[in-house]
Amino acid sequence: MKFSEYEQLRFERRDHGVLLITMDRPDKYNAADEQMHGELARVWAEVSADPETRVAVITGAGRAFSAGGDLDMVRRMAGDHDRVAHMLREMSDLVYNIINC
């Protein structure tokens, strides 16, 4: 895995093939903006293909796991059909990539 390609996710390898993934926006309670949302959607295919990882654990930096979607992102998307459609596809990818991992 190329951990350096991710800006809002941190990675830590632990013993026995455990990969700890930390969502790293503690100032926003790890709410997913466009950047994090995209990273979360694509990371699972890489985790699944990584021969060093047997299990992945996801957590949040700071005091919260995640506040969910960043409301500023939602406001930016309002009225933009193409952005909303892209985000909905990405949301589907995120869920199915986790399931397939």
List PLM regions with ranges.
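Glycine- (often His-adjacent) and acidic-residue-rich active-site loop
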Residues: 3, 60-97
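PAS-family sensory domains
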Residues: 100-101
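Conserved CoA-thioester-binding segment of acyl-CoA-metabolizing enzymes
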Residues: 1-61, 82, 96
